[in-house]
């Protein structure tokens, strides 16, 4: 018999209640809980009170959460990956193609497949005392993560299945530096690159190493330790990777931002908040930005419910009246309602733009669940909903990878056919290419001058968009962040004169600023996208006209080239909107994260930081009283001014447009270089006229055509 569990989990009887029922001291009951040996008179009293028979009472054992089991659907995606890469590797030698053709037609295909066919990641986020590691251990089926996880270190732990361990390593645990060459986040996707792996690694060993670097008891809480990876033979990791993140809100805001930026890598978010203090305002402010950054996987034509990759967990649920279901349902309802009251009216707009679905508070409420190892029934809904998403997501990834490969092949076929036609025409119609080269050289100076003028116009337009963004934001702030405006909002929205209502209002007010700023930036970025589209079309027309006059095929794809260049730059500002709009199905945005709207997440770090500063300095309870609306408004305006909130937004917007301008300059310089190289190579081919080399290229291109036709999709 487990007497303590019998009282708490089965009959829901407190020690105080049993004390009165049996007329015994509470200390005596605690002794029985320790030795599981209550006297028969107590058993009889419990049987009489509950209706349970003696055998049920005496044989009762604490319920145990069943081992989490899910169907291994990643094997289908893994099969696709192995099949395609085996096909590519087996055919590369047979294709007999040079590096230039390989780079032009095959490298992006390989990179896109690599980026698409990555296991989904689950991130566990919450304050340091919410039981993240306990929940992870339960899902893993063994105590791999230390339950005494420290809030004083910014280390993120990636859990992967042992089958995914790179061939060049043997140990279970690896610790990586927090920074290297100016980069602050170790890229877990590059673990199969030995040189990269070794450069970031600072320690390796067994699971004890994780305890040394990541717990209060450990003696190696080194500042330079930023991430760890653990390889475990756990069934759940066959379908997904897990990221265990340090609790936020424990030390510096910068650590919270690091946690947030790491969580953005995830495809599934599990947010934990203690049931006994569920969804406090700090949770709400942090979760709002987490959800904004969460990939939108649900669409009208797939099996996923709305917000399928989000679970908000009321953890340690046994602490609420011994896990009383009615009390917990009310806690979930109230937490969801507080969250809903704290978001701006257009909070869901960016997600709706991707999914074409509308979102309600009820949709969000469906993602709120309970969890505690002490009462298995309170884990069922969490496990059922998690099981759905981790079983279905690998199938979605597999399908998207296949669609990507098909779209890529279809998109490159045209250029491939044009290049093949070029070499065939060079054999039979060389004179036309001699004329073409002469015509290009004759017109190139003027074309370059015209192109330079267009580039300068776009540079000026980017600067103009930057000023417009700042001006519109400043105008919005001057009208919104005022005592009069805030008082009016408080009255119009009928905010109640209590701490919780005012906290929700302040959170919503800040969220509205985030949303409005993102909307302004999105509109300006969309405007730039139209301009870049027109520029690329104009660029293509300017080089195509010389070919068109001679009825020759053009095999220089300016659009594809420009997009490839942008994707390789890294920080691209507003050009990211252009890539999403024009080339979202290509390798540039492979994987689930490509569905995220940039402007919706750009200001998330500010939202997290400002939210913490506002509530730390507001002292809301002291403001409530007879003239509370004006008191709250004055204090809120004062906090915005004190923390220079508007300036922080302007800094982000300025950097966004500066990054845009720098990326555009790099892209057009490289585009022009590649066009010059193309013309130079074409001239060399026409002038030297090496028939053997031309025929070899024809053979290679036909081999690539056959390769595309027979690719196993």
Regions found by a protein language model. Name each.
Residues 1:
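Basic, amphipathic alpha-helix used for nucleic-acid engagement in HTH/winged-helix/SANT-Myb modules
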Residues 6, 12-35, 40-129, 142-231, ...:
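N-terminal low-complexity/disordered regulatory or targeting extensions
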Residues 20, 70-71, 398-406, 438, ...:
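C-terminal or late-domain output modules
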Residues 28-32, 271, 422:
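Solvent-exposed, amphipathic alpha-helical segments
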Residues 112-396, 589, 602-632, 636-647, ...:
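Globular "head" domains of long coiled-coil molecular machines
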Residues 356-360, 364, 385-433:
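Charged, amphipathic alpha-helical linkers/stalks
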Residues 429-671, 675, 679:
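A non-catalytic, extended alpha-helical scaffold characteristic of dynamin-superfamily P-loop GTPases
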């Amino acid at each position: 018999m487990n007497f303590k569990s019998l009282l708490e989990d089965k009959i829901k009887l407190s020690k105080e209640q049993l004390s009165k029922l049996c007329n015994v001291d509470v200390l005596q009951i605690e002794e029985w809980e320790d030795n599981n040996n209550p006297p028969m008179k107590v058993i009889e009293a419990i049987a009489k009170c509950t209706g349970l028979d003696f055998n049920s009472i005496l044989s009762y054992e604490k319920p145990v959460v069943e081992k989490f089991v899910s169907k291994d659907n990643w094997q289908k995606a893994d099969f696709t990956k192995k099949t395609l890469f085996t096909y590519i590797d087996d055919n590369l030698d047979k294709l007999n193609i040079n590096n230039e053709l390989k780079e032009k037609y095959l490298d992006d295909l390989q990179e896109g497949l690599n980026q698409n066919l990555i296991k989904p990641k689950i991130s566990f986020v919450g304050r340091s005392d919410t039981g993240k590691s306990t929940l992870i251990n339960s899902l893993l089926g063994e105590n791999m993560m230390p339950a005494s996880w420290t809030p004083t270190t910014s280390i993120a732990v990636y859990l992967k299945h042992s089958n995914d361990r790179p061939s060049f390593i043997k140990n279970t645990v690896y610790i990586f530096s927090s920074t290297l060459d100016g980069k602050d986040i170790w890229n877990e996707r590059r673990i199969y690159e030995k040189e990269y792996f070794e450069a970031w690694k600072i320690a390796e060993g067994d699971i004890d190493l994780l305890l040394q670097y990541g717990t209060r008891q450990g003696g190696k809480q080194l500042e330079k330790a930023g991430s760890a990876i653990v390889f475990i033979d756990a069934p759940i990791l066959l379908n997904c990777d897990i990221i265990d993140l340090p609790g936020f809100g424990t030390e510096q805001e910068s650590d919270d931002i690091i946690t947030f930026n790491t969580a953005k890598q995830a495809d599934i978010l599990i947010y934990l908040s203690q049931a006994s203090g569920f969804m406090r305002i700090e949770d709400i402010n942090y979760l709002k930005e987490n959800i904004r950054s969460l990939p939108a996987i649900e669409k009208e034509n797939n099996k996923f419910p709305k917000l399928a990759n989000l679970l908000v967990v009321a953890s340690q649920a046994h602490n609420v009246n011994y896990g009383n279901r009615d009390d917990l349902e009310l806690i979930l309802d109230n937490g969801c309602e507080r969250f809903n009251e704290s978001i701006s009216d257009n909070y869901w707009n960016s997600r709706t733009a991707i999914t074409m679905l509308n979102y309600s508070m009820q949709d969000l409420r469906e993602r709120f669940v309970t969890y505690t190892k002490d009462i298995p029934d309170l884990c069922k809904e969490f496990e059922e909903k998690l099981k759905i998403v981790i079983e279905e997501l690998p199938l979605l990834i597999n399908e998207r990878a296949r669609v990507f490969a098909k779209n890529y092949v279809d998109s490159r076929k045209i250029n491939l056919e044009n290049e093949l036609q070029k070499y065939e025409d060079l054999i039979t119609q060389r004179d036309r290419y001699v004329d073409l080269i002469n015509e290009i050289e004759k017109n190139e100076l003027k074309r370059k001058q015209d192109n330079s003028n267009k580039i300068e116009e776009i540079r000026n337009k980017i600067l103009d968009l930057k000023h417009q963004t700042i001006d519109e934001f400043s105008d919005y702030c001057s009208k919104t962040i005022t005592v009069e405006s805030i008082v009016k909002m408080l009255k119009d929205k009928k905010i109640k004169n209590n701490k919780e209502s005012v906290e929700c209002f302040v959170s919503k007010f800040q969220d509205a600023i985030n949303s409005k700023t993102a909307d302004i930036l999105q509109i300006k970025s969309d405007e730039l996208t139209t301009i870049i589209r027109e520029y690329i079309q104009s660029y293509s027309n300017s080089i195509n006209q010389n070919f068109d006059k001679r009825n020759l095929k053009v095999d220089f794809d300016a659009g594809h080239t420009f997009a490839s260049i942008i994707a390789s730059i890294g920080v691209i500002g507003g050009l990211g909107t252009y890539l999403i709009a024009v080339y979202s199905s290509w390798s540039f945005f492979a994987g689930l994260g490509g569905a995220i709207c940039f402007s919706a997440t750009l200001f998330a770090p500010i939202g997290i930081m400002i939210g913490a500063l506002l509530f730390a300095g507001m002292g809301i309870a002291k403001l409530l009283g007879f003239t509370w609306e004006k008191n709250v408004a004055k204090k809120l305006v004062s906090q915005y001014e004190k923390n220079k909130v508007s300036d922080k937004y302007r800094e982000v917007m300025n950097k966004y447009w500066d990054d845009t301008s720098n990326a555009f300059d790099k892209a057009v310089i490289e585009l022009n270089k590649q066009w010059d190289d193309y013309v130079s190579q074409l001239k060399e081919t026409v002038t030297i006229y090496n028939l053997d080399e031309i025929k070899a290229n024809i053979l290679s291109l036909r081999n690539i055509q056959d390769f595309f036709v027979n690719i196993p999709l």
